[in-house]
Amino acid sequence: MERPISSVHFEYVALFILCTTVFASATTSQHQESQSRQHKEASYLKMVVNATELPMEEYYDYIIVGGGTAGCPLAATLSQSFRVLVLERGGVGSGNPNLMNQEGFLTNLLNAETEDSPAQAFISEEGVPNARGRVLGGSSAINAGFYSRAHRDFFDRSGLPWDLTLVNQSYQWVEKEIVFRPKLKTWQSAVRDGLLEAGVTPYNGFTLDHAKGTKIGGSTFDGSGRRHTSADLLRYARPSNIKVAVYATVERLLLAGSSAIGALYRDQRGRHHHAFLREHGEVILSAGAIGSPQLLLLSGIGPRPYLSSWGIPVAHHLPYVGHFLYDNPRNGITILPSLPLDHSLIQVVGITDSGAYIEAASNVVPFISPRHNAFVRSPLYLTVATLISKISGPLSAGFLRLASTDVDANPRVRFNYFDNLVDLERCVNGTRKIAEILRSRALKDFKFSNWFGEQDFRFIGPALPLHQTDFPRMANFCRRTVSTIWHYHGGCVVGRVVDPHLKVIGMDSLRIVDGSVFSVSPGTNPQATLMMLGRYFGFKIITERNDYK
């Protein structure tokens, strides 16, 4: 099983492993469906303004910092009853063909180093590359589009008093607008069959629910390959009650004693604006697991000694801001298949009973020979296929620290991958399951034959150890090949930074509604639950205000 391909230019293949992108072809009817969706999108774009067009001072009932995966459905819901301002540091993605179509997914991540790119790159202290959203729609506008609801244990362990009826209604509110059933092609179908051969049963077919076994999940790419993001949910907003400001960089929260009273933000021209709260209003952070704890610290909310060391005036001592930061490690293998494959995103998932989720993707990546040839101006293209293991949880926790008092600078993050041995055991379980899938009849056709008639896979990068029963070797493989699946969360977790209503502990008029409050990743992919969270808490806040009256 260990036959790496040394002749492949690894830089380009590593880029594929990082991006796990997907493409698809369109039919005429699917194109018409996509065109129909584009007409709908114009309605929410009427609510979007460049921050340069806003007054230098204005008052709102709710100021939402971050127009991302949770922020957009939250804003749409609150606008039904209140005046809402959304402050998004990035721009609008709907006019960017690279962003809104599957074909441009790789390009967006390649350009993640530029100042205004939709994806902002960062690297953990362990050296693992990662990315965060910087565009209206947030990470839902730059991800691989997989949609699946949270596992039941997530709700039991989250520390929140969930109304599960409202949870289900909130999921459905999202799904009727932006979730689609994908069509499986060669690689995804083979992996589905391989999972079943490897004992990841039962087969649950197409379902958005989290269920042990093998299933087909939802996708936020429609049949023509067009992306739908949380920004699409702004179509539910009341236009007269909402302003969505793009290129609006919040530098700090405005505080008066123990209360939030607004936000200070900067537009593209460098001018500062003040957004203030009306009576009984709230500032709601939806800037994500990197942005929300960073903004709290820059606003003087966090550990007193740490803030003082940066010369930041302490507004409120809250010792656990930036702590309990998690990232689900990803491990797996990449092969050169022996036959051509269609592009595919993550559509099939195997939910094992040993703490690992198995997923797959296939793609075409550019290959340029290290030896430049004057007669070859264009790169060749290789079809590659991956099998990926993501662990549940995780239990290993890290931290976030400031790297600068400039809000545009990425903070320092460390996730402490596999510090908890349970995480390491789950990774070994997942990689062993990948080995079983590789041995299945379903994947036999993807092997190459040698001169002696023997068949084997050709791996790009590290292959699995030959002796999969050897735990130390498998554990070393996990540590050596660790990467991210972009499901980082925490930093403002429930019970430490926010209370069960997601209000910042010890503060008034300040709440956090995003993945930074989670201490466990919801199911196989968090985006469904983050969108649900925005809708759910928008409804809850309206109910609270009505009760208050």
Language-model-detected regions and their locations in the chain:
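Mid-to-C-terminal "cap/lid" subdomains and adjacent gly/pro-rich loops that border
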Residues: 241, 293-396, 404, 421-425, ...
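A glycine-rich dinucleotide-binding beta-alpha-beta segment and adjacent secondary-structure elements
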Residues: 245-246, 251-256, 444-521
